[in-house]
């Protein structure tokens, strides 16, 4: 049954979101240098001390890690989703005074929703002023970067990318032990500086999605010379979910590591749902504006118009959406190229625009009005996520002519956007077998001029409905290694239904694994610190530290306690897998202690131990079996 507005009101009145620190961690903030007012968040994972053989203690340092959970994991912050998060960015030193404020929405639809008494109880009531560039100006991060200006957002992300690891390099060099990576041409410095960030944005190799109407945002950067990021999709549909559920899904997503969130709502009250999400989101929010535009014409793609779509862009930009997926590369002449595909056009946005092109037998208004779209984007600093409307929906269709024809057009559109100093990233597939994945990255780098690549997986096999978070994470780790800057998560419900909270968590953790594996393979400085800390804790049977250093401390503890729930088991030198007598790490520890007691290296001690056992065999009568 459809949810009535009164039901939605009650839901929001009683709404609550997940708050509180992640187990074993505490929030820490770093300050800016150029902009001292900055407070850059990170999470520190506390560790217990190690007890040496002589009884003395070795202090293990807290491990700082990148954190995108916002104030929701800070116990010192009082969360009120009805008030929203603080407008932090509006308190920073202004980069440009050429910004005007508007008391009322500039979009016709925004004004209509504001005047509609039927939606009054659904609205987010603490309205922010609406800002935009004055006199046709440009407030994009790329515009400032190309003028040689370092913005507060640029310093923020530079400090954030370094993860506060600098102090550990001198004090605990063993934590930085790592294998040499293969970056496939990426140029990752040992330390990220604000100037490096500025240069990468000016070149178009990275973006900071940060709409000036999203002051609650904690800025982040997307680019192949930075940490690989992940995106989580949320959103209601015509049959499921409420505003409160979507706000909680956003908070839940970022708790488990989502760097950005896309609101793909297609149900009722899209405008109001999005406002609640943005006002409470510390991460960039992306949308696919054509979805809402389609709802405005009752789902009839052929009735879409440029004027309607333009108004939708302004409506969403004024709310604070940080990036738009726009399928402007679906051209009329490319549609016949999909005729022989096994699965045709699987992108929802791509199929909408293909239907419009065929109905009118002309190029899409997204393509013909692209420069006008750029004018809107630069006035609010909304980034493009140029959509892959012709992405393959099955292995059989991977890397075909339609897919790459659209990709080349996205490269053409990238250059047009850059002419207007508008930030761009490129969306990618999809369903691709492992041996064809690298070609996707190479094509994108060549034809889209190193603009950041943002891929959905890709899924590496089509035989596992219910497990597509795994089939896609295989491809995601691989393409992330090759240079993809952001990975769009896939949940176990992919192809089957809308994800719930558990699916969101599963998808986010799975993709954090893929992104981190890619960072390790690329040789990202400091990427292996957390791995090394956890491995040391594992070898020393520091169970609590193992739980806390993992991506999902709660699940790690739950699995351990299924078989060894006693509190004393947290100090045991074995787990239920091998038991007390067959633990390889316990045997290795014993060997190390034996060597230390003899004052020898491990190999010498091993040989001596073998010789001692041989002498015992002879002394006891050389019998194979003792009676």
Swiss-Prot record:
List the record's Gene Ontology CC terms alphabetically: cytosol
Q: What is its EC number?
A: 4.1.99.17
Which processes are annotated in GO (biological process)? thiamine biosynthetic process; thiamine diphosphate biosynthetic process
Q: Which positions in this protein are listed as binding [4Fe-4S] cluster?
A: 575, 578, 583
The UniProt entry, under InterPro entries, shows:
ThiC, ThiC-associated_dom, ThiC/Bza_core_dom, ThiC/BzaA/B
Print the organism lineage: Bacteria, Pseudomonadati, Pseudomonadota, Acidithiobacillia, Acidithiobacillales
Task of the protein: Catalyzes the synthesis of the hydroxymethylpyrimidine phosphate (HMP-P) moiety of thiamine from aminoimidazole ribotide (AIR) in a radical S-adenosyl-L-methionine (SAM)-dependent reaction.
Gene name on record?
Answer: thiC
Q: Does the keyword Hydrolase apply?
A: no
Question: What is written in the cofactor note of this entry?
Answer: Binds 1 [4Fe-4S] cluster per subunit. The cluster is coordinated with 3 cysteines and an exchangeable S-adenosyl-L-methionine.
Identification of the protein by name: Phosphomethylpyrimidine synthase
Q: Which family does it belong to?
A: Belongs to the ThiC family.
Looking up Pfam families in the UniProt record yields: ThiC-associated, ThiC_Rad_SAM
Tell me the first and last residues of the signal peptide: none
Binding positions for Zn(2+) per the UniProt entry: 431, 495
Q: How does it assemble?
A: Homodimer.
Can you tell me which residues bind substrate?
233, 262, 291, 327, 347-349, 388-391, 427, 454
What cofactor does this protein call for?
Answer: [4Fe-4S] cluster
GO MF annotations in UniProt: 4 iron, 4 sulfur cluster binding; carbon-carbon lyase activity; zinc ion binding
Substrates-to-products reaction catalysed: 5-amino-1-(5-phospho-beta-D-ribosyl)imidazole + S-adenosyl-L-methionine = 4-amino-2-methyl-5-(phosphooxymethyl)pyrimidine + CO + 5'-deoxyadenosine + formate + L-methionine + 3 H(+)
Identify the pathway. Answer: Cofactor biosynthesis; thiamine diphosphate biosynthesis
Which keywords accompany this UniProt record?
A: 4Fe-4S, Iron, Iron-sulfur, Lyase, Metal-binding, S-adenosyl-L-methionine, Thiamine biosynthesis, Zinc
């Amino acid at each position: 049954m459809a949810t009535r507005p009164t039901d939605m009101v009650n839901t929001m009145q009683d709404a609550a979101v997940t708050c509180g620190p992640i187990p074993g961690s505490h929030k820490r903030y770093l300050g800016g240098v150029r902009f001292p007012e900055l407070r850059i968040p990170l999470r520190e994972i506390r560790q217990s001390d190690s007890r040496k053989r002589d009884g003395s203690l070795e202090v293990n340092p807290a491990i700082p890690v990148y954190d995108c959970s916002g104030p929701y994991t800070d116990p010192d912050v009082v969360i009120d989703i009805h008030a929203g998060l603080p407008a932090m960015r509006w308190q920073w030193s202004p980069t440009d005074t050429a910004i005007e404020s508007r008391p009322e929405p500039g979009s016709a639809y925004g004004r209509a929703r504001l005047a509609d008494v039927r939606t009054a109880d659904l609205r987010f009531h603490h309205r922010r002023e609406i800002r935009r560039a004055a006199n046709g100006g440009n407030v994009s991060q790329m515009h400032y970067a190309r003028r040689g200006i370092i913005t507060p957002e640029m310093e923020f992300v530079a400090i954030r990318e370094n993860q506060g690891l600098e102090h550990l390099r001198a004090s605990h060099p063993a934590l930085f032990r790592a294998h040499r990576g293969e970056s496939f041409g990426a140029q990752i410095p040992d330390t990220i500086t604000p100037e490096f960030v500025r240069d990468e944005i000016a070149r178009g190799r990275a973006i900071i999605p940060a709409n000036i109407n999203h002051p609650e945002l904690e800025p982040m950067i997307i680019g192949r010379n930075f940490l690989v990021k992940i995106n989580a999709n949320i959103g209601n549909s015509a049959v499921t979910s409420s505003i409160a559920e979507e706000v909680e899904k956003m908070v839940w997503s970022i708790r488990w590591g989502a760097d950005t969130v896309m609101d793909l709502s297609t149900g009722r009250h899209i405008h109001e749902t999005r406002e609640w999400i943005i006002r409470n989101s510390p991460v960039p929010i992306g949308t696919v504006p054509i979805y809402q535009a389609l709802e405005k014409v009752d789902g009839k793609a052929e009735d879409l118009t440029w004027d309607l779509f333009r108004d939708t862009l302004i409506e969403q930009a004024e709310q604070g959406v940080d990036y738009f997926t726009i399928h402007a590369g679906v051209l009329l002449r490319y549609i016949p190229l999909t005729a022989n595909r096994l699965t045709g056009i699987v992108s929802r946005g791509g199929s909408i625009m293909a239907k419009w092109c065929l109905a009118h037998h002309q190029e899409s208004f997204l393509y013909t009005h692209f420069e006008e779209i750029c004018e809107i984007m630069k006035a609010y600093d909304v980034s493009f996520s140029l959509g892959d409307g012709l992405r393959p929906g099955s292995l059989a269709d991977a890397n075909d002519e339609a897919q790459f024809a659209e990709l080349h057009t996205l490269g053409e559109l990238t250059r047009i956007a850059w002419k207007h100093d508008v930030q761009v990233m490129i969306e990618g597939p999809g369903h691709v077998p492992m041996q064809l994945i690298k070609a996707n990255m190479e094509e994108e780098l060549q034809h889209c001029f190193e603009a950041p690549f943002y891929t959905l997986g890709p899924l590496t096999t089509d035989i596992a409905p219910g497990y597509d978070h795994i089939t896609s994470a295989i491809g995601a780790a691989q393409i992330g290694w090759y240079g993809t800057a952001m990975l769009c998560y896939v949940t176990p419900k992919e192809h089957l239904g809308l994800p719930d909270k558990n699916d969101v968590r599963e998808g986010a953790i799975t993709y954090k694994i893929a992104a981190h594996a890619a960072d390790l393979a690329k040789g990202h400085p400091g990427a292996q610190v957390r791995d090394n800390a956890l491995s040391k804790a594992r070898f020393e049977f520091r169970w609590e530290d193992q739980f806390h250093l993992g991506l999902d401390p709660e699940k790690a503890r739950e699995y351990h306690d299924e078989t060894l729930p006693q509190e004393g088991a947290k100090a045991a030198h074995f787990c239920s897998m091998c038991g007390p007598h067959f633990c390889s790490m316990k045997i290795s520890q014993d060997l190390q202690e034996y060597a230390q007691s003899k004052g020898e290296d491990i190999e010498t001690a091993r040989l001596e131990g073998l010789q001692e056992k041989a002498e015992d065999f002879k002394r006891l009568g050389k019998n194979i079996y003792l009676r």
